[in-house]
Structures are given as C-alpha cells and as structure tokens.
C-alpha cells in the first residue's frame, strides 16, 4: 500500500497516469563519458531576490573549494531601492556563495521529460554545500558614489544609537556629503558594524588624523573614566602634591631648634665647669632664656649656617679664658706654705668678675652672636695670650707689692712680740714654754682673722656694681674662703681644675718669672719671707 500511495502521489505530481513507461540510463553511466556530469547544490539561505531566469556561475577551485555566484533579479533591486532609499546603481547585482564539494558514491537523479514522457536516470557526481558570504563589501566601494553616504550614515546612526535616535555627531555628518574613496570605505565599514555591533571606524584611523575638524564618534558608557593621554598636553594631569621652597620652613625650623639646643647644651656644659663664678640656678635660668631667644629667632631669622658656627666659636672662647685664669691664679698651688699670701687671690677674682659680664652678655644675647660674622669673634673676644699675660703680671705685681708691705708690718710686729715674750718668759722656763705655745697659736689665729678682714675691706673698695646673681656668687666665694682658710689659692673649684688638667704644668715656670718680677718691684720673694719666718721661730726656740 505504501508503494501504491507513493506512486499515486508521484503520478499526481508528474501527471504521468497509470500507464507503464520505459526507464532509461543516462550518459553518466557510460564510463567513457567525459562531457556530462550532474551535481547537487545545497544552500543555507537563498534570498528572494535571486533571478531564476538568468544563468548562475560555478567556480571550482583547488582543494575542492567552490564559489557560486547567483544573479539577482531587477524586481528585487527596485523593491530594495524603495525600502532603503538607495539609487539604482547602489544595489547588489548578485549573491555570492562559497563552500566545498564532496563526491557521491551511490546517488542517482531521475529526469522526467514532459514532452516525450521518457524517464532517464543519471548518476550524481558531487554534492556541493555552500553558505552565503558578504562579498558585496569588497565590490561595493567601486560602485557606491559619495552622495549615498549621508543616507547610510543616518541608517548607521539608528543601528548604533542606544535609544534608536540619530546621535548629534552622526546628524552633523549626514548634512555634508563626503567625496573620494574615503566615503566609500566609510560606508563599507558601516555595513559591517551594523551586523557585528562594532564601532563605526577605528579610533586611530589615518582619516581621523588627516581631518581634525571632524568630530570623533565614540560609544562608551558615561560611567567610564576618561583615559589619560601622555602626549596630550591640554588634558589635566594627575594631581601630585608638589614640594616647593615654602615647605622648607618646617625643615629649617626643626634644624634651627637643633642648633639652638646645641648652643644651650654647650653653654650650660661650659658654665657647669665653673661653679665658683656662676651658680647652677643662674645657668638654668640662662638656658631657659636662650631657648626663648631661639624660639623668637625662628620666626625672624631663617638662616641656619650662623647657628651651626656659633657653638664652635663659643666653645673655643671659654677654654681661652680658662687658660688665662689658670695661668694667672694657679701659680702658687704646688706650695702649701704660701697660705698667708691669700691676698693674691683678690685681684684674680676681681679679674674673673671683670670678664664675667662679657661672658654673661654673650650668653644672654645669642641673637647678637648670630648676626656677627665668624671673623668678629676672633677680634672682639679672643685676645692674644701675650696681652693677657702682661696685664695679669702688672696686676699681680701691684697686688703683691701691697701684700708684701702688709706682711712686713706683720712680721715686724711678730718679731717684737716674740722678743718681748722671750724676755718675760726667761724667768720661768716651764710656764714660758706653755705660754709660748699658746701665744703662737693665738697669733696665728689673729693673723688669719686680720687677713680675712683686710680681704673683705678690699672687696668692698675695689668691687664694682654687679648684677644680683654676681653678688650672690661673691658671697658664696667669701663664705667658701672663710670656711677653708688653710687652702690659700686652692679655693678655685677642683672641677674647674680637673676640666683643664692639661694646663697645670704651666704654673711652675710662671712662678719663677713672677718671683723675679716681685723682687724687681721692691717686694719680698717667697723664699725670703719663708726664711724670715723660720728665723723668728728659731729665735723663739733659742730663747726658750
């Protein structure tokens, strides 16, 4: 029944009827046939514009590649012109298909001739499968004129627009036609982008560089950040915090604080080595004043090199004064027998006091020291050692002459007292020996008291008006002398002498020079005074 049904269906379609017909084999079954061949073509898509009345061309290339070109009908082209608004010459004349071919093994084709009613069977040679290609892209620039670009631009704007409207740059391009092959190439790329959803032209195309007046159409989301181009100088550069010369104020201020701290440290360290001249309270007070001056100076002055140079000069000045003081005042330290020559200490302390206002003025005015140049330090403060030593020798010679006159009177009184006591004690030897011992002790105590009183009187006469802290320091030095009468010139602080131990070998040659000066000035050398005292003591012993 199936066969009958199929025959009926086939007979109805071919209008053959129920009669029996002869089946013939075609020329393809003949092995000597080389002129006739039958092939089948399978299309993936066949447009309605294909003209069936015209012949198509099949091109078989190497490696079984086949290209089929099918012409389009004129009616289809006219319909396309009406829909898309294109001109007559802008239509696509044909459709191109490309694919590959494969040989058949056992496939046949039946051909029915309606005129004769004969049925012929032919053998199939190849099966060709092709797909539609966009070969009109390559052929289109040759045939498209420039005036067709504005309409395509409008269409392209509708394809690329997000809301279906033509963007403003596209509308501007649609107003003016483009000339030359560039417009044709532009149109071809637009056709491609309408299908693939890509940008309408490359960003770095040569056309964009040659015509800077044309606006650049870029389709991107509004949330994306603008790309920074290093070659474009007009764009805003990234904001980077720049360090200028004004920002150096903080660094210089910090360095300035360090310099002031070094000044205060060096000055307080040098002042701590002289407790007899400057008290600890006054040094701390001066340190605070220097810090206050340093803070004020940070606002007015920004020059750091003078600050760096000041501590070195200040440290060099104070050891120079220390050498002068040690050379003038410590010449009698190795001899403890010169206890009675304590008035020598008076002019040297006065000389210390004369020099002390200069040092205090230097410490209380660091701002003035910074304003001076390095050369002014040597001319104003660092006096030559020869001038200092000559002045000290003159002052010492005058003071020793006065002290020698006082001692001569005391020695004369002591000798007369000893002679009278020896005559009175000759009657009673036992009681005389005891009284001599007591009188000698009393005389030594009286002499010490008289010397202290004379020192106080000389202090009051020679001393100039001094600041409050200097008076306080002088009272401390007097109390120190009263408490330690047997030290003589050793009342200078041990810390100060230990601070300058390398200067102690100098007093011995200075002592020899000073003894010669004392003798030439009419005073008594130290050796003669000691011999007189020993003779007086020996005479008292002989009388006993």
Curated annotation (Swiss-Prot):
Modified residues annotated as Phosphoserine in this record: 205
Any GO BP: transcription elongation by RNA polymerase II
Places the protein is found: Nucleus
Biased composition (Low complexity): 264-273, 305-319, 333-374, 396-407, 450-483, 503-513, 526-544
Pfam families: EAF
Primary residence: nucleus
InterPro entries: EAF_fam (IPR027093), Tscrpt_elong_fac_Eaf_N (IPR019194)
Region Disordered: start-end pairs: 147-544
Feature: compositional bias, Basic and acidic residues: 193-202
Residue ranges, compositional bias (Acidic residues): 425-440
Biased composition (Basic residues): 287-299
Record's keyword terms, sorted: Activator, Developmental protein, Nucleus, Phosphoprotein, Transcription, Transcription regulation
GO molecular function: transcription elongation factor activity
Listed GO CC annotations: nucleoplasm; super elongation complex
Function summary: Promotes transcriptional elongation by Su(Tpl)/ELL. Essential for development.
Record family assignment: Belongs to the EAF family.
Name of the protein: Ell-associated factor Eaf
Organism listed in the record: Drosophila persimilis (Fruit fly)
Upper taxonomic lineage: Eukaryota, Metazoa, Ecdysozoa, Arthropoda, Hexapoda
């Amino acid at each position: 029944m199936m066969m009958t049904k199929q025959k009926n269906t086939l007979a109805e379609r071919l209008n053959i009827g129920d009669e029996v017909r002869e089946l013939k084999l075609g020329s393809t079954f003949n092995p000597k046939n080389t002129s006739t061949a039958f092939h089948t073509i399978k299309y993936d898509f066949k447009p309605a514009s294909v003209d069936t009345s015209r012949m198509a061309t099949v091109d078989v290339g190497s490696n079984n590649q086949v290209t089929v070109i099918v012409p389009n009908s004129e009616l289809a082209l006219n319909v396309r012109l009406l829909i898309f608004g294109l001109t007559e010459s802008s239509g696509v004349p044909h459709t191109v298909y490309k694919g590959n071919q494969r040989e058949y093994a056992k496939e046949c084709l039946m051909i029915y001739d309606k005129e004769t009613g004969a049925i012929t069977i032919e053998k199939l040679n190849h099966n060709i499968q092709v797909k539609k290609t966009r070969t009109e892209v390559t052929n289109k620039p040759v045939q498209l004129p420039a005036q067709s670009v504005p309409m395509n631009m409008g269409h392209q704007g509708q394809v690329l627009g997000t809301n279906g409207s033509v963007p403003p740059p596209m509308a501007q391009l649609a107003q003016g036609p483009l000339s030359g092959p560039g417009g044709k190439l532009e149109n071809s790329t637009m056709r491609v982008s309408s299908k693939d959803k890509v940008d309408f032209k490359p960003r770095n195309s040569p056309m964009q560089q040659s015509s800077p007046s044309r606006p650049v159409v870029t389709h991107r989301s509004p949330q994306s950040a603008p790309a920074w181009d290093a070659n474009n100088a007009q764009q805003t550069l990234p904001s980077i915090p720049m360090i200028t010369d004004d920002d150096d104020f903080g660094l210089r201020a910090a360095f300035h604080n360090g310099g002031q701290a070094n000044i205060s440290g060096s000055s307080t360290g040098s002042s701590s080595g002289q407790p007899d001249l400057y008290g600890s309270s006054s040094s701390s007070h001066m340190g605070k004043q220097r810090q206050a001056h340093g803070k004020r100076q940070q606002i007015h002055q920004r020059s750091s090199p003078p600050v760096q140079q000041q501590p070195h000069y200040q440290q060099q000045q104070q050891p120079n004064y220390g050498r002068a003081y040690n050379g003038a005042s410590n010449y009698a330290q190795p001899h403890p027998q010169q206890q009675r020559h304590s008035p020598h200490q008076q002019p040297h302390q006065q000389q210390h006091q004369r020099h002390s206002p200069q040092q205090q003025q230097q410490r209380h005015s660091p701002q003035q020291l910074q304003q001076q140049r390095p050369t002014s330090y040597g001319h104003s403060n660092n006096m030559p050692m020869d001038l200092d030593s000559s002045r000290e020798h003159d002052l010492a010679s005058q003071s020793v002459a006065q002290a020698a006159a006082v001692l001569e009177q005391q020695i004369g009184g002591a000798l007369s007292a000893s002679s009278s006591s020896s005559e009175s004690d000759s009657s009673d030897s036992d009681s005389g020996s005891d009284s001599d011992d007591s009188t000698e002790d009393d005389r030594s105590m009286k002499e010490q008291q008289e010397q202290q009183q004379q020192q106080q009187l000389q202090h009051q006469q020679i001393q100039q008006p001094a600041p409050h802290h200097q008076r306080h320091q002088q009272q401390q030095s007097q109390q120190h002398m009263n408490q330690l009468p047997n030290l003589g010139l050793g009342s200078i602080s041990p810390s100060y002498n230990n601070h300058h131990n390398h200067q102690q070998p100098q007093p011995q040659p200075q002592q020899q020079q000073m003894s010669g000066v004392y003798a030439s000035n009419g005073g008594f050398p130290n050796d003669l005074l000691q011999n007189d005292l020993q003779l007086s003591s020996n005479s008292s012993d002989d009388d006993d």
